[in-house]
From Swiss-Prot:
Belongs to the class-III pyridoxal-phosphate-dependent aminotransferase family. HemL subfamily. Its cofactor is pyridoxal 5'-phosphate. It comes from Actinobacillus pleuropneumoniae serotype 5b (strain L20). InterPro entries: 4pyrrol_synth_GluAld_NH2Trfase, Aminotrans_3, Aminotrans_3_PPA_site, PyrdxlP-dep_Trfase, PyrdxlP-dep_Trfase_major, PyrdxlP-dep_Trfase_small. The modification N6-(pyridoxal phosphate)lysine is found at residue 265. Its EC number is 5.4.3.8. Pathway: Porphyrin-containing compound metabolism; protoporphyrin-IX biosynthesis; 5-aminolevulinate from L-glutamyl-tRNA(Glu): step 2/2. This is Glutamate-1-semialdehyde 2,1-aminomutase. It is found in: Cytoplasm.
Length: 426
């Protein structure tokens, strides 16, 4: 029995399912989850001492690679001054200034401790600002685990929200309208049906929780226009895409300006940080300047602020944005070429520093329904064939993969060599 198997057996006795976030349990791909002992650069090492080229990157934050010296140095310098104060610090101002510089649509920003907290707070703010209750989200998009966002679509392109599982009251979920990603007509229908009731629309600009699905050319700008037409707050959820699709986020890449933006992952440099920000007139509706309440004991934590500032400062250096995108392109297109070589039905999609692998005959995947038609069983086999060769992909057919600046040309070529062998066995 491996050390990971022993640890998983032990963990299940004291932690629900043996993990602290469901996808880590490997239920989507089968087998025993890999327990990690340490990480460095593009590599993680498991409890048995086996090294893997890592394309999960802690689910996105590790854009510089693991254990980056600039971040470690910043954290070690901050720690002796105290771990938490519950009071304002200069470091939270400095990070906020950098965020507003990198993402011009953000005029004011509030720090929180997670992406879920950011999206939950942004939606509460939008409801308070507009005096409306209903919200629009998209089937297959994930915005954290708050009640109003754990809602699935019923039959048809548009439905009154239905809870995605136990614990979410139907009376609460009914305020969430679910539309089809990349389908403006479904959004128009929602607004036409409830023209004066929709507080906000929230969207992943690149859907990264049904693998990796970029928006169609007119989709995001069409959403912007509909929100303007009906007086709804337009929220772009950049928890995953922020600073990764482009330095200014997916909103910069696709040239669209939201009213509010949510951030997470990279903004903390590996520490637990989230943020939401946007137009001054909306953000001033949040306490203490406005009536919408939001608070957090560890919001603006000084250690997390130091890590986030170091990460964004390093990432902002000339050439890094282009390098990240180029490395991702090389990897994704390499996967596709190898699949073609072995006559495996396969499509790779990528934007900036994120990518998705789809086992399908379709040339392009554009929404949740198309994702569900992909061959998840074949992905699971591919995942384990890669894992055996020391390549750690996301353990789910429905999660995006992440490149880092630490991945070298040699790492990518080693990954593709492993993929060549894996595709040959499918």
């Amino acid at each position: 029995m491996s050390k990971s198997e022993q640890l998983f057996e032990k963990a299940q006795k004291v932690i629900p399912g043996g993990v602290n976030s469901p996808v880590r349990a490997f239920k989507g791909v089968g087998g025993t989850p890999v327990f990690i002992q340490k990480a460095e650069g593009a590599y993680i090492t498991d409890s048995d001492g086996k090294k893997y080229i890592d394309y999960v990157g802690s689910w996105g934050p590790m854009v510089l690679g693991h254990n980056h010296p600039a971040i470690i140095d910043a954290v070690l310098k901050a720690v002796p001054n105290g771990l938490s104060f519950g009071a304002p610090t200069e470091s939270e101002i400095t990070l906020a200034e950098l965020v507003t510089k990198l993402v011009p649509s953000i005029e004011l920003v509030r720090m929180v401790s997670s992406g879920t907290e950011a999206t939950m707070s942004a939606i509460r703010l939008a409801r308070g600002y507009t005096g409306r209750d209903k919200i629009i989200k998209f089937e297959g998009c994930y915005h954290g685990h708050s009640d109003s966002l754990l809602v699935k679509a019923g039959s048809g392109a548009l439905t009154l929200g239905q809870p995605s599982g136990p614990g979410v009251p139907a009376d609460f979920a009914k305020h969430t309208l679910t539309c089809t990603y990349n389908d403006l007509d479904s959004v128009k229908t929602a607004f036409e049906q409830y023209p004066n009731e929709i507080a906000c629309l929230i969207v992943e600009p690149v859907a990264g929780n049904m693998n990796c699905i970029p928006p169609k050319n007119d989709f995001l700008k069409g959403l912007r226009a509909l929100c303007d037409q009906y007086g709804a707050v337009f929220i772009i959820d950049e928890v995953m895409t922020g600073f990764r699709v482009a330095l200014g986020g997916a909103q910069a890449y696709y040239d669209v300006k939201p009213d509010l933006t949510t951030l997470g992952k990279i903004i903390g440099g590996g520490m637990p940080v989230g943020a939401f920000g946007g137009k001054k007139e909306i953000m001033e509706y949040i306490a203490p300047t406005g009536p919408v309440y939001q608070a957090g004991t560890l919001s603006g934590n000084p250690i997390a602020m130091a890590a986030g500032l170091a990460c964004l400062t390093e990432l902002s250096k000339a050439g890094n944005e282009e390098k990240l995108a180029a490395q991702t392109k090389t990897l994704a297109e390499g996967f596709k070429a190898l699949a073609d070589k072995h006559n495996v039905l396969f499509t790779a999609q990528y934007v900036g520093g994120m990518f998705g692998l789809f086992f399908t005959e379709q040339a392009e995947i554009t929404n949740f329904q198309e994702v569900m038609k992909c061959d998840a069983a074949k992905f699971n086999r591919f995942f384990h064939l890669m894992l055996e060769q020391g390549v750690y992909l996301a353990p789910s057919a429905f999660e995006a993969g992440f490149m880092s600046l630490a991945h070298s040309d040699e790492d990518i070529q080693a990954t593709l060599a492993a993929a060549d062998k894996a595709f040959a066995q499918l």
